[in-house]
Amino acid sequence: MCFSIHKLVGDVTEASQVFVSSQMFGLFSKKPEVCNVLGDSITLRLTAEQTEGKYSVAEFATPGGVGQPPHTHDWNENYVVLEGELNLNIGGHPTIIATGDSYLVKAGTVHAPTPNGDFCRYVMIGQPGGVESVFKSLKANEKELGDMNKVVEIVTQAGVKIAG
């Protein structure tokens, strides 16, 4: 599979093509942590600790009807779709990313990733690293995730701001 990666360098986005197979993602860590939270299966492929804080990599397997509410945060996220289609809902506008494509969501941008269809598998690369703290916090509090006020409290403490 070939996809483009868009990297933010200063105020300029540089694009490059990367050839990758889905098996490659298994090489990132021998026993990656999996966080099954709010309908998402999130595999933490690389953490900030493993990359000296430079970035984090998480792989999502998300069924249709599941998704994140509109939110912002202080880090960039690059989404790479491996299977299906992802709607990033940028600023409330549908933004469909197809298999093999990528999209850079800059820090502070309102977005709400949801599958565009029955299922989507994608990789999210957060820069700088540390986004995994959101997923680990949700996993650690999974018994309280039926209370959406508690979910908002948990993600807010991890640096996510729910929009609206």
Residue ranges of model-derived segments:
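A short, N-terminal "cap"/entry segment at the start of jelly-roll beta-barrel domains
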Residues: C2-K54, E142-G164
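Short acidic-glycine-tyrosine-enriched beta hairpin
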Residues: G26, G92-V110
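Conserved short histidine dyad/triad with adjacent acidic residue
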Residues: T43-L44, S56-T72
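Conserved hydrophobic/aromatic beta-strand scaffold that supports enzyme active sites
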Residues: L44, V57-E59, N78, P94, ...
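Ligand-binding loop in jelly-roll beta-barrel domains
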Residues: T51, N87, A107-E132
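Short glycine/proline-enriched turns and hinge-like loops at secondary-structure junctions
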Residues: K54-Y55, T72-D74, P115-D118
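Glycine- and acidic-residue-biased ligand/ion/polar-headgroup-sensing regions
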Residues: N76-E77, V81-L86, G91
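A hydrophobic, small-residue-rich beta->alpha segment in the mid-to-C-terminal subdomain
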Residues: C120-R121, F135-N141
